[in-house]
């Protein structure tokens, strides 16, 4: 795994503000490889990857976050899913031509930002905001302003790094239930906004923080690796087939002689023939008998 694919948490000793810094290269490339995405779509997936990593780092529980853009433009949907272990996957779907250099609004059109938080234990939460900002970072800040009520700023950069294509970002957020000065927070945000793409992508986290906040006392914690990992499996696809009406499954078998289950996230294919389907039904019947 690339040394670059890491998420760092940090705290300001004299301000009730926390920060997160993430840089990704290999993970981003693994998400877009095998897909013929135009450059603007690759870039928005990189930015979504950075945003999802930063948001999952705010989780206080085991679970995952999905950050999705959807609209009526040529980019119908772009989504990244990540969990508290910083395991990421993502995909985009297009419904028209996307020109080189297209902006977020030109790609999505009239659309929404949907953030779904799914704890392993407890209820799922979903927040939806209209895409009113010109950038993904601006749209995410709008989401935080409407839902969390915690002052939050995001800074996302992408471009060519020393080791190839890279993306990175920084999240600043006032700590909850603490008396934080908004002036102090805005001052730290102004400092953070000066980060250059090449600095964020190529320098170690310690050096980035020193360049931004050398007059502040900052505690930098151990990094967490960010990686690509798809949760699909033959077993999971089999469970999906079990939920379908038997006559629908039989019709698919008659038409093609097999059922091909394709994972859009990683490109894996899982093929089931009549023998496989019979085995799935036998297993399902055995499980039902054990339950009763």
Swiss-Prot record:
Family annotation (CDD domains): Hsp33
Keyword Repeat set for record: no
Key words, A-Z: Chaperone, Cytoplasm, Disulfide bond, Redox-active center, Stress response, Zinc
Cysteines engaged in disulfide bonds, as pairs: 230-232, 263-266
Post-translational modification: Under oxidizing conditions two disulfide bonds are formed involving the reactive cysteines. Under reducing conditions zinc is bound to the reactive cysteines and the protein is inactive.
Locations listed in the record: Cytoplasm
UniProt cross-references to Pfam families, sorted A to Z: HSP33
Protein's job: Redox regulated molecular chaperone. Protects both thermally unfolding and oxidatively damaged proteins from irreversible aggregation. Plays an important role in the bacterial defense system toward oxidative stress.
HAMAP family according to UniProt: HslO
Record-stated family: Belongs to the HSP33 family.
Protein name from the UniProt record: 33 kDa chaperonin
Species whose genome carries this gene: Erwinia tasmaniensis (strain DSM 17950 / CFBP 7177 / CIP 109463 / NCPPB 4357 / Et1/99)
Gene assigned in the entry: hslO
